[in-house]
Amino acid sequence: GRVDCPILFPDDPFLSPVHANFFYRDQKLVVRDEGSVNGVFARITGQVDLPLGARFLVGEQMLEVELVATIDEGAVEDGTYYFASPRRGGDLRIVQRLRGGDTGFTYGALGATIRVGREGNDIDFPDDPFISGHHAHLAWDGAHLTLTDLGSKNGTFLRITHERTLVHGDYVFMGQQLLRVEIV
């Protein structure tokens, strides 16, 4: 964190005063988010289950997955239908979270998969130097959501909800700090 911590980053404004805690339990290293504002993110390898509402990082982009609510498009009491843009199909939307807490773009998925990267994907960030051409893939089967890193150079990071067991070589991202786990 920023204040009175064994691992101290006093100049990182994106860290909470006490951001995270690293400790051993049953001879395994664990990281715990201590209620930080911006979260603790762990690099994923391969495919992981992704709960709805989870936040993840690709490059400098913080993205969140939401389930699109079913809306009754029927007429109101007097028989009038609400006129607006037509709805896209799909059950999911990806929401970009901006610094300061604002919402950036929202992408309504048309199908069961979404690819994220720099170019040639469903969602592209051509100006983000930390995103690979084809960086990550989301898949939804109607009941389960998965996130897969596609061998990106800088990794895909999933926000932990409470604690996560770490192994040698794992990466943890918090604030502006990228930490590599070295268990000796």
Q: How would you name each of these model-derived features?
A:
Residues 1-52, 58-59, 107-176:
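Forkhead-associated
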Residues 47, 55, 72-76:
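Short amphipathic alpha-helical linker/capping segments at the junctions of internal repeats
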Residues 61-130, 139-143, 177-184:
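Regulatory inter-domain linker segments that are low-complexity and enriched
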